[in-house]
Curated annotation (Swiss-Prot):
A single Gene Ontology CC term: cytoplasm
Protein name, UniProt field: D-alanine--D-alanyl carrier protein ligase
Upper classification of the organism: Bacteria, Bacillati, Bacillota, Bacilli, Bacillales
GO MF terms, alphabetically ordered: ATP binding; D-alanine [D-alanyl carrier protein] ligase activity
Gene: dltA
Pathway(s) of this molecule: Cell wall biogenesis; lipoteichoic acid biosynthesis
Gene3D superfamilies: 3.30.300.30, N-terminal domain of ligase-like
Pfam family, one: AMP-binding
Compartments where located: Cytoplasm
Keyword terms: ATP-binding, Cytoplasm, Ligase, Nucleotide-binding
Species of the source: Staphylococcus aureus (strain Mu50 / ATCC 700699)
Protein family (similarity comment): Belongs to the ATP-dependent AMP-binding enzyme family. DltA subfamily.
Binding site for ATP: T144, S145, N284, T285, Y286, G287, P288, T289, D365, K473
Sequence positions that bind D-alanine: D189, V293, K473
One GO process term, biological-process aspect: lipoteichoic acid biosynthetic process
EC number from the UniProt entry: 6.2.1.54
Amino acid sequence: MTDIINKLQAFADANPQSIAVRHTTDELTYQQLMDESSKLAHRLQGSKKPMILFGHMSPYMIVGMIGAIKAGCGYVPVDTSIPEDRIKMIINKVQPEFVFNTTDESFESLEGEVFTIEDIKTSQDPVIFDSQIKDNDTVYTIFTSGSTGEPKGVQIEYASLVQFTEWMLELNKSGNKQQWLNQAPFSFDLSVMAIYPCLASGGTLNLVDKNMINKPKLLNEMLTATPINIWVSTPSFMEMCLLLPTLNEEQYGSLNEFFFCGEILPHRAAKALVSRFPSATIYNTYGPTEATVAVTSIQITQEILDQYPTLPVGVERLGARLSTTDDGELVIEGQSVSLGYLKNDQKTAEVFNFDDGIRTYHTGDKAKFENGQWFIQGRIDFQIKLNGYRMELEEIETQLRQSEFVKEAIVVPVYKNDKVIHLIGAIVPTTEVTDNAEMTKNIKNDLKSRLPEYMIPRKFEWMEQLPLTSNGKIDRKKIAEVING
C-alpha cells in the first residue's frame, strides 16, 4: 500500500454502499465518505496550514480527516472534552486558515474560516478530488500535555502514517471488511490505530461514545447491537469493561482480536482477558505519540503470561529502531519518529535529533531489552525521592498488582513543603474490604517480600474503580485530588 486515499477510493468504487463509519445511529457509507471529503478538500485546497477538526465521535470527523489529507494540509483533532483555555492555546499555536466544526454548537474561533457539517452536505463542490498529499507532508498534528502547561503539537508525516497502517494490517489476523471498535477520542493518537487500518481494509469503524467511557453497560448494549470483530482501546478501558460478566467469548463470539496501547497492560487484566476470550488474538503494543502511535508489539498468549509476571511490549516494527541510553532511557530512531513539535523549536531540540537525515526521539520512558523482548519500566519523570531514596512509583504499582488482594493500584506521593513525606496506595481490592487493618496488613506483608521497607506505602485508600480520563487512561491527577482531599 503506497497511498491510503487511493486504497479507500478503490474500495468505495467497488463497494459504494458498505458502511465506513458508525456512531450510534449515524452512519456513512464509503461512497458518502469519499464524496463528502472531496467536497471539503475543494474548500481547503491551497491551504498551507493544518485544519482544526473540532468535535467528538461524529462520522464527519472522519470526513474531516480524509478531506484534509486529500487537500494536503493535514488536520489537528480537537475533542469537545478539551478545556476551552487549552483549545484557545492550540488555535493560537496553529493559526489555522480553516476550522471544521462537526458539533451542533457554534464554535467561536479567533482564527480561520469555520465550516459546519451542513456547509459540506449542501455544498455544490465536485465530489471528485485528486489527492494532493505527499509522503513528507504533515498528515496530522496531535497536541499532548507539556510540562510547562503549554500543549505540544506532535507532527506526523504521511509516509509514517502509511507505514504504520501497513504494519497494523500485517498484524491483523481477522482479515478485511471487519467491524472495528474505536474507544479513543480523536485528539488521542490511539484512535489512529483503529481509523486507518480499519478503512484501508474495507472495514466499518464503530465509535465508542464518551458516555460509554465510565459506563460499561452502555457499551454492552452497543456490542449486542453490532457484532464487533476487532477491539482497539487502552488497557484501563478494557479493565473497566471486564466488570461486565457477560464480556466473554460465549456472549460475543465475533470478537476475535484485541489491540492495546497507551498504557502498560497489567498482567492480571491480560490473564482475565485470555481466560474469557481463549480463541482471540491479543496484542500488547507500545509507542509514544512522537513515534506514530506504536513501535512494538507482542501477541499475549497463556505461554507469555506464564513466562512473564510483568508483560513485555514485544519487538520493534519496521521504521523503528530502539535502543537505550546509559541511564536506561528508551530512544527511538527511524521513519516512525515525528517531525518535531509545531512551532516549538526549544522543546523539539530537547528530545529530537535530525542529524544526517535520521530522526531520533528520546522518549522519557525507562526500558530494558531482555530475552529478545522490550520491557517498559515506567516514566523517568515518575521518579521521586523519599527519605533520600530515589524510587520509581510504577515499580511499586507493579508489585502491588501482583498481590492476590489487589486488582488495580496507583501510588500517590504526599508532599509537604515541596518534599515527599510518604506514599499512599489507591487500591481497587479483589474482594470487599470488611476489615481495613487486616487488608492493609495482608497487602503490606505481600510487599515486604518484594520491596524494601521505604518503598511500601504508609496507608491505602480503597476505591471501587480507578477514574479514567476522557482518553480512557487512568486519571492520576483525579486520584491524587481525592486522596489529598
